[in-house]
Amino acid sequence: MTGQSRIGVTGLAVMGANLARNIARHGVPVAVHNRTGARTTEFIEAYGDEGEFTGTQSLQEFVDALERPRRIIVMVKAGKPVDGVITELTPLLDEGDIIIDAGNSHFPDTVRRTAECAANGIRFMGVGVSGGEEGALLGPSIMPGGDPEAYAEVKDVFEAIAAQVDGTPCVVHVGPGGAGHYVKMVHNGIEYADMQLIVEAYDLLTHVAGLDAPAIGKIFEEWNSGDLESFLIEITGKVLAKVDEKTGGPLVDVIVDRAGQKGTGTWTAIDALGLGIPLTGITEAVFARGLSALRDERKKASTTLAGPNPSAAEDRTDLVDDIRQALYASKVVAYAQGFAQMRAASLQNDWNLDLGAMATIWRGGCIIRAQFLNRIRDAYAEHPDLDNLLMVPYFTEAVANAQDAWRRVVVTATEQGVAIPAFSSSLSYYDGYRRERGPANLIQGLRDFFGAHTYERIDAEGSFHTRWAQDGTEVRTD
């Protein structure tokens, strides 16, 4: 081996293979390796003419093929497989070499691996990569976390292979430690909410407006302009328009209504609970997938549990436009919650996340790429310390203009017995967030009664407790 490959990729399933091809297509020599050597051979036979590849059959051969400091991208299944690769690589590497986990790892694992690698003199980076198989090959959104000096060693490669929007590569160093995988996790959580809002709109258009899949597909095609323009809206139109070759009807009508999930939405929701951030849209999207999985139970319940008698919409045109406005307002809330979560995590972990930069790199390559993100980028450019996107004048006005339609949609869905948890929880969050005084004062009173958890007063400093079971007097406890 000559040790002339600039970077290495181990793990040649579709994502790893496409990422390696993308790198090589940009003139960067790449060493490739897979746990099963046959796949490496197949890769070289299939794609060897796309760039300068060095196929290797062992990790030692793979490591020897790389220039120093060695830069190794690991593209294997999250969890124990990543730890296994690191364990095998560590004794083969030298101080200052770089391991880059570009899979969907949970950020606490990335924090742990960073420390473990550092103890052996190895630099570790957790890098979020979004865009699926096509993005990996043609240009993903890349969210690198870890040592900035390590990032400097691969910055030119990442900027070359990332998606480009308005001449700007969709990659930026996110922050230290687990920041990159954290941001990717929240990206995926927002993706859950985005998709749930879309399917709730589809459900309303089907069961309240009485439209079929092709007609709804055309509506989504129309919506894929202006503020709703996005990759997910675009492909929704395509999925709804697809004809099933077997039945001749819409393909979507013969797909089982049970949604899968890989866990990143759950991670996002659990993390938000730990931070104390209300993440209603994303969390309801996760719950909705869980409910969809209870297909056998739902079949039984559909013939047992009572519901309203549905009726056709009186004005279909007005309803369709109301749904469009409700979709946009709910989308604003979902993103506001996701960005608030990233802000809270950044403060807690001292990551110093540039939230405007996150919006910028999500504009291309990734699944949630959307015109809408330009508005978010601009919002953080003007207000870097923004608490909540809803407080930006543009979004404040946009939601205010949509709120009447939004409320009509939630009422109509309730009357018709159509579940829209993401729409309705987003509206509830909006109404709760805009209230100066909510009902949590009673919660504190109840907590103090049964658990002496104390409460604060609006007219005095300090913490107080009422002796409920004794003489009913109030005492200061701090």
Predicted feature locations:
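C-terminal substrate-binding/catalytic lobe of Rossmann-fold NAD(P)-dependent dehydrogenases
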Residues: 179, 192-415, 419-420
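Hydrophobic beta-strand scaffold residues
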Residues: 30, 55, 124-125, 279, ...
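NAD(P)+-binding Rossmann beta1-loop-alpha1 motif at the extreme N-terminus of oxidoreductases
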Residues: 1-70, 93-96, 133-136
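Glycine-rich, highly charged phosphate/nucleotide-binding loops
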Residues: 54-61, 78-86
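C-terminal amphipathic alpha-helical interaction region
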Residues: 400, 405-478
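Rossmann-fold dinucleotide-binding core
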Residues: 7, 64, 82-85, 100, ...
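Short, ordered loop/turn segments at secondary-structure junctions
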Residues: 35-36, 104-105, 129-130, 417
